[in-house]
Amino acid sequence: MSDLREQALEYLSRLGSNPATAFKEDRVIETVKEILSEIGLEHKVDEFGNIIAKISGTNPTANPLAIVAHMDHPGFEITSNHDGNYIAQAMGGIPPSSFESGVPVQVILPDGKRILGSTMGMFGEENERQVLIKLDQPQDLEPPLSAVFDLTDFELDGEHIRMRAVDDLAGCGSILSALTRLSSGDAPPGDVYGVFTRAEEVGLVGARLMAEAGTLPPETLVISAESSRSLPGAEMGEGIVIRVGDAGFTFTADAESVLIRARETLQQRESGFKCQRQLMSGGTCEASAFAVFGYQTTGIAFPLGNYHNGAPEGRIEAEYINVNDYLGGIELITEAARRVSDRVNTAFRQRIREVPPNLRQRMLDTGN
């Protein structure tokens, strides 16, 4: 576990050092590509900028498995200059207090340099979701540019990982860690895809376009790896969550069986392995985008605090997850990739399938 922990946290720290909003994920994209090259995995980039890495399986009849996460996070896009300050459009769901005056932000230049500033309150009509941004040190900028909350890139705080963008860099980091483990051990039965999408926060755009295009084989089982607001039954510190649905869909039992079989295997191997199961209806994840286009889908979720940087009492703060939930999620999806061909043999399926002879006989005796 110590090697897994060190590598997983290093990947996540590297990803977190690259702030990104929808349509401006360039530096996260480069970091993902860099790590994939270090792992020794080839990848392709589709016409929409989504990244697809692949590990080939040993059994051509086994279902492929895809694990999907997005690279963007809610923030602002600076669109124009206004009397020496800058108009910025909200990109994705941000807390209501983001539209107040005095919220510290970082403006991200094309070379990655960050310029500090703060909001000056709402600009225009409320439904336009715009703010005015004032730079700490006035200078001429060339829009469009991303602006993000001035929060920590990455911090390990006891049992918590705190980041501006846990959602969904934790998903991306977990996929990269799982691919690292799978590439250095025995090959999985089916092909395994690591998928890194764009513009999720403004409507699952990258995932929808990729699913529509049929980039993944139609028989692929798709797992969405998300960081989602903790709630009863999906509580921080109680383990990775098998997500059985979201606000839009109940996901498919066949795809979920891969995760259930992986959970059973891990709990037999490690008596303390924690895993929860819950329908998380607080929002919609990328599994729904693939479900609409006919894929069998399921999901995992890291229970998240300060969802979209919204802290109690309206404060803007870093998101956070439990470090052991994160590491457990990596173990779960790694094991799931190895259990694709074994998913019909979950304990529950076997118990339901195999009617005890005495009960069968009693039904026969009393059936007429």
Predicted features by range, described:
Residues M1-N368:
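N-terminal hydrophobic/helix-forming segments and targeting peptides
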